[in-house]
Amino acid sequence: KEYRRQRQMCIRDRIDVLNDRDVQTIIISPAKMEELKKSDMADRLLVHNIKLMTAPPLSEWNGQALSRTQLKEIQIEDLLQRNPIEIDIHKVASHLEGKRVMITGAAGSIGSEIMRQVASFNPYKLILVDQAETPLHDIRLELQDRWRDIDAETIIADISNATRMEDIFREFKPQYIFHAAAYKHVPMMEDNVSESIQVNVFGTRTVADLAVKYGAEKFVMISTDKAVNPTNVMGCSKRICEIYVQSLAKKLQKEGGHTTQFITTRFGNVLGSNGSVIPRFRDQIQRGGPVTVTHPEIIRYFMTIPEAVSYTHLRAHETLSDL
């Protein structure tokens, strides 16, 4: 107890000194990240609007100089008090190498990470579909910077527009489809029920049906834990999607002659994803609090975006005997 009291005093004294000197940014080395995670120093600094940044190891500096572009701002999700789960997805690379891969919702946080991981597997072609123009343009620029050799199509389209989606399928005939497009903000969907049904339900039906019609090998749908015994419109819409995809898979299995496999993965809280609670927490902290949660005893469990997407790849390429 005495050690803890002295340690807290030390942290408080440090922050007082920083405030007295009007320090706005602190740069730490990667080696100190683990120490930072284990202390509440980061929380206290964030409350006082002191920015945390990390520098690369000395071996990566340009000579003896450190470029500002090498500095990375530390986010709350970087302080996750556990090591990221390492999932070996290289064994699934062969399944996507040389394939035509479609990603719906490609401009979103999950869809864009799927794109990054798939791009590293050397696909024949990427078909990136989203209705958000500016984020999709950003993805296009990222592709040009990092994966110049990959043939990619960035397509603005509404997945619930059956005519438009059929044109896309007819032209590109995707072999693998990662369906991440959806509305997912619970309060917004409570107030916009028709849009939730139109995009989440009818959009999924359109993409799934076209996957079968044009002979896709696999259709991987990104769902949510809110589809379990749903208590809101968004969760209900995603549960309907799951039921439709499951029913379609059973129908095809009974009929025979179809090759499309359907896989559904459910995500819980994903750190850094659009709609994640983390940006809200960050804003509340930067405004000086309070940080609000739904219940005093609530416990939230998180996974990172790369973890979630790697898990999706792993599940998508396991055989039934592996499950």
Model region roles, listed by residue range:
Residues K1-R7, I11, H313-L323:
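Single conserved hydrophobic/aromatic residue that forms the stacking wall/gate
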Residues D209-V212, V233-R315:
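NAD(P)-dependent short-chain dehydrogenase/reductase
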Residues Q64, H179, Y183-I243, S247:
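Conserved Rossmann-fold NAD(P)-dependent oxidoreductase catalytic core, especially the SDR/UDP-sugar
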